[in-house]
Amino acid sequence: MKKVYKKNMENLDFYKIFKPQLSPKKMLELGIFGGSYFGSNIKEYPKSWFEKAKISKTFDITLNRFRVKAGLSREHWIEKGWIFKEDPLGWFQWYCRFINGRRITHIDEIQIKRWKNFKRHVTAIEKNCERGDLGCRKRQRQAILQWAYNPFI
């Protein structure tokens, strides 16, 4: 019988493998989550992040860089167990707090693992699109932008 080996992520230093390509400030400037991720609750974040940010109190698809809706509903996030009490808005909220220096090891490990797994969408764009064809796979490009990967590949 063939043994199946699972990659043991626990042995990895999660902080070393986490290398986002975009800062929260840059992501907000480019246009993510229809501009409405935080609503009006932005006081805990640096003001400089919002100087050129595309923000709105309600979701506005025209504020997304690729003008498409990308991602799943909040209800789906909750159903999948992707929302934690520490970051009730989800991954991007965690990322912003992480960038600002907050560390909660068990949450960081989960979120960094989720970020790492999202790279499959970068690979899909690279395999299926001509380099620089920003009209190709716009939904995936918007999604990887919302996960701090460079969508301009």
Model-derived features with residue positions:
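Compositionally biased, intrinsically disordered low-complexity regions enriched for acidic
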Residues: M1-E86, G90, R102, T123-A143
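Intrinsically disordered, low-complexity, Lys/Arg-biased terminal tails
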Residues: W94, F98-I153
